[in-house]
Design a protein with these regions (language model features):
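Activity-critical C-terminal alpha-helical subdomain
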Residues: 167-205
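Single, functionally critical "micro-switch" positions that shape active/binding sites
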Residues: 87, 163, 192
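C-terminal substrate-recognition/cap domain of FAD-linked oxidoreductases
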Residues: 1-148, 152, 156
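General beta-strand structural signal in soluble alpha/beta enzymes
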Residues: 52-53, 162, 198-199
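Short basic/hydrophobic patches in alpha-helices and adjacent helix-turn junctions
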Residues: 148-159, 175-176, 187-190
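Short amphipathic alpha-helical interaction segments
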Residues: 137-141, 145, 166, 176, ...
Length: 205
């Protein structure tokens, strides 16, 4: 499910005028057809419009094409980053609004899509594409991006990461995110790694 900005990339159509969701079903032909028919009914009841299979079929063939991001990174001062987080269904709308708003000052394009979905929530990817004056400026921009992103995520009640891990960019905010669980994780790490040799400077440090 792609927001308007990323839908234009997913559809390879710079004039595409709405968010887009690609639907698929697995199983026997009859079962898959029945599932798709029901999904389309749900979409229609919520204002969606069936635009046919061409967009999804084209996307399937290029969904792992990262050349747009690679081209940005290969340019002098290019800035590209992916931020993935998660929240409940009731909270993800507020998180999306807060995070995309917080990122707009730092990028030429702010793209968003939902990826992994569950009964109780969903993960959100926000992709940033932009340009600084030089590599040093790009590095400084990335630090600003992560500070603003982490703040927006936590303030909106989301979790810092879905499945990519926290990494160094989120490390300063992990204690706040974990709350009282921080002490438990710290004690577990001390018990398993009393000499502090496993991935030093990361979780629990």
């Amino acid at each position: 499910f792609y927001d308007l900005a990323e839908a234009r990339h997913a559809m390879k159509d710079s004039g595409f005028g709405s968010p887009v969701m690609f639907l698929g079903a697995e199983g026997s032909a009859d079962m898959a057809a029945a599932e798709i028919a029901e999904l389309l009914k749900v979409c229609a009841r919520n204002g969606g419009q069936d635009i046919g299979p061409d967009g999804a079929e084209g996307w399937i063939g290029r969904r792992f094409d990262f050349s747009t991001i690679e081209n940005v990174l290969n340019s002098r001062g290019g800035v590209a980053e992916t931020i993935e987080i998660a929240n409940t269904w009731s909270g993800i709308g507020g998180t999306y609004d807060a995070l995309t708003k917080a990122m707009k000052p730092f990028a030429d394009e702010v793209l968003g899509h939902f990826s992994h979905a569950y009964t109780d929530g969903v993960s959100l990817y926000v992709i940033l594409l932009g340009k600084a004056d030089d590599p040093a400026g790009a590095e400084a921009r990335l630090k600003q991006i992560w500070e603003a992103a982490n703040r927006a995520v936590l303030d909106s009640g989301a979790v810092l990461s879905h499945h990519h891990g926290t990494g160094i960019a989120r490390n300063d905010h992990v204690r706040e995110a974990l709350g009282s669980s921080w002490d438990l994780y710290g004690r577990l790490k001390e018990a398993m790694d009393p000499s502090g040799i496993l991935n030093p400077g990361k979780l629990g440090s």
